[in-house]
Regions:
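Short, glycine/acidic-rich beta->alpha junctions
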Residues: 20-25, 60-64, 109-110
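Glycine/threonine-rich flexible loop motifs
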Residues: 43-63
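An anion/phosphate-binding loop that grips the pyrophosphate of nucleotide cofactors and donors
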Residues: 36
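Extracytoplasmic/secreted envelope proteins and their assembly/folding machinery
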Residues: 26, 30-33, 66-69, 111-115
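A short helix->loop->beta-strand "cap" motif at the edges of active sites that frequently abuts
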Residues: 75-79, 97-98
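A motif-centric signal for short, conserved binding hotspots located
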Residues: 72
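Secreted, periplasmic, or luminal enzymes acting at the cell surface/secretory milieu
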Residues: 2, 6-7, 12-17, 21, ...
């Protein structure tokens, strides 16, 4: 088992003046992936990007996470991504990887649960709780989001969530209940 950090969780502070760049961390991860039977990349959204009481500005993952996944997948054809977070994200690298495990917000036992799934000790049986769109532009809230400081307009009527995508006959990456 070889570990490589791959990216930083948050932006540098004054005390971090000597830390490696994201590009250097990605390069280390690529080198580790080249010799591995399987490369497992952990990415997603931390409390720096989403949380209770505030909205995200985009459904994109951090650029350094996307760059890391693509670079590792290019170096190792057997790349599996473990995605953490509490909401939908775009995954431009999805066609480049062998597998995806959406671990959600795992809490204190999340690491053990992910390890049990990755090693085959348990069979994952969860289903998606949201529809994963192909882009933000096909989302029913596009054009109304993010709203104002105290208001949020929901103009999709009863066609919220998966009902919108079904009624509009839109292709999606993962439908509600997938898995």
């Amino acid at each position: 088992l070889t570990y490589a950090q791959g990216y930083y969780k948050s932006a540098p502070t004054k005390k971090d003046k000597n830390r490696l760049s994201d590009a250097e961390l990605t390069k280390q991860a690529v080198e580790a992936a080249k010799g591995a039977d399987v490369a497992v990349v952990f990415v997603g959204l931390t409390e720096d990007f989403e949380g209770e009481g505030y909205d995200r500005e985009t459904i994109n993952m951090p650029a350094n996470h996307n760059a890391l996944v693509s670079a590792v997948a290019k170096a190792n054809a057997n790349t599996v991504v473990v995605l953490a977070g509490g909401s939908v994200v775009l995954m431009p690298w999805l066609g480049e990887v062998k597998g995806l495990l959406n671990s959600g917000l795992g809490g204190q036992a999340g690491g053990i649960a992910v390890a049990n799934i990755l090693t085959g000790a348990v069979n994952p049986s969860g289903k998606t709780s949201e529809t994963y769109p192909t882009s933000f532009e096909v989302n029913p809230t596009y054009g109304n989001y993010p709203g104002g400081p105290v208001t949020s307009e929901h103009k999709e009527s009863v066609f919220i969530g998966y009902r919108y995508y079904d009624s509009a006959n839109l292709d999606v990456v993962f439908p509600f209940g997938y898995g």
